[in-house]
Amino acid sequence: MKKQRIVVKVGTSTLTHDSGSLNLRSMEHLVRALADLHGCGNEIILVTSGAIAVGTARLGLSERPRELRMKQAAAAVGQCRMMHIYDKLFGEYNRSVAQILLTGDDVENPDRAEHLRSTFSALLEMGVIPVVNENDSVSSAEIETGHHKVLGDNDTLSAIVAALCQADLLVLLSDIDGLYDADPRTHPDAKRFHQVKDLTPEILEMAGGAGTWRGTGGMATKLSAARIAMESGCDMVITNGARPEDLYGIVEGQDIGTRCLARKKEDVL
């Protein structure tokens, strides 16, 4: 199997229970799969959501905060908790992790983006698994003020990271098995797209609204991420995060989820 540079994005609904507390069993299964793939020689970057949801539960709040400063507080508390668990779980497989928190300005500014690329490169060379999240404590302020470019969701962030790091594969672990011609949660006869070569207007029209209340990403954000990844020469797969063991087959090219095929380099140029 060819060694690959792989970016895996995991959503809030996969990482947490309905209460917002961390789903440790789900995290354990994900970490085991990523550690296995890393042990096979692949380079792994994990983009994780969930900071605000986890912080909300950790602070004993009854619902996701609406006030800006409370969102920032929840994000700070939740991110600390999540990194503690990731460090512990990956450590059980003798894997080191590094935290990277990003804002839109970090990837938009050419100088900062180049420094960021160098940091990723150094970490991967040393066998470290970068764990990436948007810096919600800062980015929330940007969303409110409009002073800076805002990433807004981790589907987009993961695609930007994949493009920046020239990844071979981006996998979005979601609460759905892939891209369908209708919402499979309300249409049992919905058909899954196995491969997507072009993001046609018809496909874009099929994308629904936001996902679960605990996250911000729906299918529309995933297709937006697919465009970024495909144009950078990176395959992207949308699949169900409830089955992290599917990552093994996805890396081998098996028909799992929906694979959005990278544009050929001559098409990108």
Report each predicted region and the residues it spans.
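C-terminal catalytic "cap/lid" subdomain
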Residues: 1-269
